[in-house]
C-alpha cells in the first residue's frame, strides 16, 4: 500500500489539513493518509492544547473519511518527536508499505535543518503541497513530488485567534472539531 503521512501539531486540525490530505491522496495515488499528531513537537516550545485533546481533535476531524486514520506512534515516546525516528519506526513495523511524507512547500526551505535530514531524504519521498506565496525550493538529495491544491488561507493560529475574539470558525474546521472546541472551551481567553 502507498501511505501518505501527515505530521503536525494540529492545534486545531482544520479544513486545510483535510484538503491537503485529500489532494495528496488523489494526485500521488495513495491508498490512505495517516495523520501523525506530535505529542511533543520539536519545533515548538509549547502547545496551547494538551496532547491528549489534540489527539481527540484529529480523530474527530478524520472520522468521516474511511481513507484517513490517526496513528498514535508519536504518543509512544516520552521525548520530542522527530520525523526521521517516526519514519524509521513505521518502515520497521510496516515493511510492505511505501510511505510519502506530506509537507507544505514553504517547509521545504527548512527541511535541511530537520533532525538527521540527509538520512531522512534517503528514507522517504515527500509530497510537497503549495501554500499561498510559496515556491518549491527542493533541498539537494530530497525526493519531492509536487501536489497542487486550491490555495486556501486557513491556519490553526488564525482559528485560535478567532475563537479568542468570539468569532465563528464554522466551515474552517470540521463540525465535530468545532463542537469539541466549544465543549472544552478551547482557545477562549
Swiss-Prot record:
Domain of life, per the record? Bacteria
Q: Which GO terms describe its biological process?
A: NAD biosynthetic process
Q: What class of enzyme is it?
A: transferase
Q: In which pathway does it act?
A: Cofactor biosynthesis; NAD(+) biosynthesis; deamido-NAD(+) from nicotinate D-ribonucleotide: step 1/1
- What cystine pairs are annotated? none
What keywords does the record list, in alphabetical order?
ATP-binding, NAD, Nucleotide-binding, Nucleotidyltransferase, Pyridine nucleotide biosynthesis, Transferase
- Keyword hit for Disulfide bond: no
The protein's GO terms of the molecular function aspect are:
ATP binding; nicotinate-nucleotide adenylyltransferase activity
Q: What is its EC number?
A: 2.7.7.18
Recorded catalytic reaction(s): these are: nicotinate beta-D-ribonucleotide + ATP + H(+) = deamido-NAD(+) + diphosphate
Record-linked Pfam families: CTP_transf_like (PF01467)
**CDD domains to which the protein is assigned, alphabetical:** NMNAT
Q: What does this protein do?
A: Catalyzes the reversible adenylation of nicotinate mononucleotide (NaMN) to nicotinic acid adenine dinucleotide (NaAD).
Q: Which family does it belong to?
A: Belongs to the NadD family.
Q: Which PANTHER family match?
A: NICOTINATE-NUCLEOTIDE ADENYLYLTRANSFERASE-RELATED (PTHR39321), PHOSPHOPANTETHEINE ADENYLYLTRANSFERASE (PTHR39321:SF3)
NCBIfam families, per database record = cyt_tran_rel, nicotinate (nicotinamide) nucleotide adenylyltransferase, PRK00071.1-3, PRK00071.1-4
Under what name is this protein listed? Answer: Probable nicotinate-nucleotide adenylyltransferase
Q: Which gene encodes it?
A: nadD
